[in-house]
């Protein structure tokens, strides 16, 4: 449902497993046997699980602050209990309802102006169907805590330490995720945008260390 991405009506396309299949289609279309994947926020849980399910095709993976990927049982239960109502609100309210979501880009006022403006242009293209289906089938099922101790490939967490609600999840990640390297930044949730130069350096060094 983001930007020009497709937003099918069929709910089956929004599961983490379905995303993994799409990543494989992209990999094969690129003609590469092994690659690196990087996930931001909600996408982090999707790329992390892909790296677990398709480890033979992943050299390493990177992720940023993700409270959905590292959600505890209480948070997951809350999302599951509220998913239907939240999804229906988006379908009925459209773009106006999407703009009320706490993580909408319009609230990311600390971003550099040119990045903020680009995000807002993209946000105007949000698909209510895509966002509604994401709330139903993606967000409540993205947690990777069950597979984290068995993560088979090197993984880099680029953590924005200004995001207070991620602190507990970061500590959990450091304690439980196998093969984890972590680099911390003086940034918030959007670490790759707020600290782009440092983020690029960290990711480049991580990739170079594995190839």
Regions found by a protein language model. Give the residues of each.
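Catalytic histidine-centered segment of alpha/beta-hydrolase-like enzymes
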Residues: 187-200
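Conserved catalytic-core motifs of eukaryotic protein kinase domains, centered on the activation segment
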Residues: 5-11, 72-75, 168-169
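Alpha/beta-hydrolase active-site loop signature
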Residues: 1-3, 68, 188-191
């Amino acid at each position: 449902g983001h930007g020009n991405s497709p937003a099918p009506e069929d709910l089956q396309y929004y599961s983490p497993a379905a995303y993994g299949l799409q990543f494989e289609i992209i990999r094969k279309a690129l003609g590469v046997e092994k690659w690196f994947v990087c996930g931001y926020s909600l996408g982090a849980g999707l790329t992390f699980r892909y790296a677990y399910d398709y480890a033979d095709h992943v050299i390493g993976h990177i992720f940023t602050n993700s409270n959905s990927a590292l959600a505890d049982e209480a948070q997951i239960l809350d999302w599951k209990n509220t998913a239907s109502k939240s999804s229906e609100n988006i379908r009925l309210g459209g773009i106006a309802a999407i703009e009320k979501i706490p993580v909408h880009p319009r609230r990311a006022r600390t971003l550099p102006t040119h990045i903020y403006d680009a995000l807002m242009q993209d946000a105007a293209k949000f698909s209510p169907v895509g966002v509604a289906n994401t709330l139903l089938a993606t967000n409540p099922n993205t947690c990777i805590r069950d597979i984290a101790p068995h993560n088979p490939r090197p993984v880099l967490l680029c953590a924005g330490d200004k995001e207070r609600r991620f602190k507990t999840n970061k500590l959990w990640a450091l304690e439980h995720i196998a093969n984890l390297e972590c680099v911390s930044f003086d940034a918030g949730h959007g670490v790759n945008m707020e600290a782009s130069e440092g983020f690029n350096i960290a990711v480049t060094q991580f990739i170079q260390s594995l190839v």
